[in-house]
């Protein structure tokens, strides 16, 4: 017998729904700037810049101090704990700089993977202990949404039913705790692109994963109108020899979503999954042009695919601030256009934008 004990008040629901809708309004998407210290170090190493707190702060200051018109393309920014409390050169908190631009501030809440014994190297995600207290403090500090990434991979006997169910339940528990504390949960079940599987295999697995996630969200009384989904696009594995067009990726992706994601969800913000900047934009554009019913906003939550050209332009030099901001603005505007199905590839995007950003077994 199902009993009804309201999880949220009408006021809480209204606030959550308004936050979620504002993030994805009018083609806006999310900048994922929540890389851990180690992951940011890998990015800096590629441009031969030392991984110090000051260098990380300087790069993020350049991104966040971009012209206020960025709020036409970026509705939210996900921060790492370190970045939430960092300041610009004048002593102003980054989070306040973003808020003054009308951008919603988010925070990475998961604490990385832990092995699932008895599986083929599968993992679940840590971070539920003390999560409510962390969410409450972050809300006081100006944060309005959270992010939790669960990782599933396609391999021999993977993903297992155990991994799918365990990660779905962890995502649902996280989402419930977020909402109790006034944070919109971004639910991120990522089927990573490692492997040589084809498009059809990825679609099958993605559908199974998303179906389990939404069953778990329902079980945990999560208010869907106050959530956002951050899934992988349906793509072939990175090592697959067969290549697919953006239109094929779009059809497989929207079909999978149409079969599994309730229309109550206000927005779906895709992760880029190691695609080049340009491929991530072209695929998003094709998804928005796909001739299937699309009751949700279909947008982006990109990290590498919004920052690669900007990092290359910066190179660790303060003198390159203007070029760095220009590169970032260009990618943000391109993805905003793609989120409306209006992006036109010009062929003049620059070398950095066409390089694959794939990293095997990628972790934030």
From Swiss-Prot:
- Kindly list the positions at which Phosphoserine occurs in this protein: 36, 89, 132, 272, 276, 299, 301, 309
* Reaction catalyzed: beta-D-fructose 1,6-bisphosphate = D-glyceraldehyde 3-phosphate + dihydroxyacetone phosphate; beta-D-fructose 1-phosphate = D-glyceraldehyde + dihydroxyacetone phosphate
As for subcellular location, the record says:
Cytoplasm, Cytosol; Cytoplasm, Cytoskeleton, Microtubule organizing center, Centrosome, Centriolar satellite
Q: PTM Phosphothreonine: at which residues?
A: 39, 119
CDD domains named in the record: FBP_aldolase_I_a (cd00948)
Q: What is the annotated quaternary arrangement, including any partners?
A: Homotetramer. Interacts with BBS1, BBS2, BBS4 and BBS7. Forms a ternary complex with G6PD and TP53; this interaction is direct.
Q: What is its main location?
A: cytoplasm
**UniProt organism field:** Homo sapiens (Human)
For this protein, the record's PANTHER family field holds:
FRUCTOSE-BISPHOSPHATE ALDOLASE
Q: Where is the active site?
A: 188 (proton acceptor), 230 (schiff-base intermediate with dihydroxyacetone-p)
N-acetylalanine-modified residues are where? 2
Documented effect of changing residue 229 to P: In HFI; affects proper folding
What is the official name of this protein in its record? Fructose-bisphosphate aldolase B
- Specify which residues bind beta-D-fructose 1,6-bisphosphate according to the UniProt entry for this protein: 43, 272-274, 304
Q: Which UniProt keywords apply?
A: Acetylation, Cytoplasm, Cytoskeleton, Disease variant, Glycolysis, Lyase, Phosphoprotein, Schiff base
